[in-house]
């Protein structure tokens, strides 16, 4: 199976690798995994007072497609509102990265990670 140039670019030069402090009330963290292949993805967002995602980062342990999917979505969600980020679907990730059918689960993980990070952020905001 050959990876697309976009997958290879994001795999070899991943964007936004890292982590934010979980104690920051403006940070939402999403940790998701796929038992089928062992991929684990942690995606974090930092949201400003206007509800715009001003920064995002990730740490992914998995295949090239999982890393590329994480890297891509961190680029996509920066500057978006929570609502806009929630609307990102795995099918858009598949299309952009030209993922083969056997790697579609990686794009689903990325979509799930976005939703989990947003859910965590919202639950922190509701507590304050």
Swiss-Prot record:
An annotated GO cellular component: cytoplasm
Domain of life: Bacteria
One annotated GO molecular function: iron-sulfur cluster binding
Disulfide bond annotation, renumbered to this chain: none
GO biological process, one term: iron-sulfur cluster assembly
Record-linked InterPro entries: ISCU, NIF_FeS_clus_asmbl_NifU_N
Gene3D superfamilies: 3.90.1010.10
Function field: A scaffold on which IscS assembles Fe-S clusters. Subsequently gives the nascent cluster to other proteins. It is likely that Fe-S cluster coordination is flexible as the role of this complex is to build and then hand off Fe-S clusters.
Description of how the protein assembles with itself and partners: Forms a heterotetramer with IscS; each subunit of the IscS dimer contacts an IscU monomer.
Family under the similarity heading: Belongs to the NifU family.
Protein name (database record): Iron-sulfur cluster assembly scaffold protein IscU
